[in-house]
Swiss-Prot record:
Positions of dCTP binding: R105, S106, S107, M108, G109, R110, D123, T131, L132, E133, Q152, Y166, K174, Q178
Natural source organism: Methanosphaera stadtmanae (strain ATCC 43021 / DSM 3091 / JCM 11832 / MCB-3)
Keyword Hydrolase: yes
Gene designation: dcd
Protein name: dCTP deaminase, dUMP-forming
Pfam family, any one: DCD
Residues of the site described as Important for bifunctional activity: G120, Y121
Length: 197
């Protein structure tokens, strides 16, 4: 596997093999990545009386979350210790022979802001907005603005195309085509559906 350079990223974008829509400024394309911007939708956990989240109970996980849409030029403030789901402004589409990783920009990390907890890997064939799992591990509240560059996507070629890429009918492609921050769909995992077997 090899990481795509800016030259190759531009070529793949021009050919339509990789889609990032929209790229409004050529400066988003970095030496080996593309900067992605923050969307305007956020989801955070409500304070509830339930002692814990259990993937085996019947509660809809969406009921644990509150949603907010931030107006243009207004900030979303994330406080120390808080966690929120957000989304990229851009829609991303990958071919069957490219994987991607989303990494936080170092400028955000130096403020104590992480862009993903564990879901930084994007399978070949994925299409949609990318859900970000944003945490503030710093000691100060931080303002985040829709349209702000907050993360970068890195592309890697595979040794061969996937036989069953993300979105294939035989795949567990729960987040295919997502258009905003999506809550966990862990209850749709085959091992949860089968009672942990």
């Amino acid at each position: 596997m090899a990481i795509l350079s800016d030259k190759d990223i531009k070529k793949y974008l021009d050919e339509g093999r990789i889609v990032i829509d929209p790229i409004t400024n050529e400066k988003q394309i970095q030496p080996s990545s593309v900067d992605l911007r923050l969307g305007d939708q956020f989801k955070g956990f409500k304070i509830i009386t339930k002692p814990y989240i259990d993937p085996f109970d019947n509660t809809d996980l969406e009921s644990y979350m509150s949603s907010i849409t931030v107006e243009e030029d207004k900030p979303f403030i994330i406080h120390p210790g808080e966690f929120t789901l957000a989304t990229t402004y851009e829609n991303v589409k990958l071919p069957d022979d490219i994987v991607a990783r989303v990494e936080g920009r170092s400028s955000m990390g130096r403020l104590g802001i992480t862009m993903h907890v564990t879901a930084g890997y994007i399978d070949p064939g994925f299409e949609g907005n990318i859900t970000l799992e944003i945490s503030n591990i710093g000691k100060m509240p931080v303002a985040l603005y829709p349209g702000q560059r907050v993360c970068q996507i890195v592309f890697e070629t595979m040794t061969s195309p996937s036989e069953k890429p993300y979105g294939h009918e035989d795949r567990d492609s729960k987040y295919m085509g997502q258009t905003g921050p999506q809550v966990s769909k862990i209850k749709e995992d085959f091992d949860i559906i089968n009672g942990g077997k």
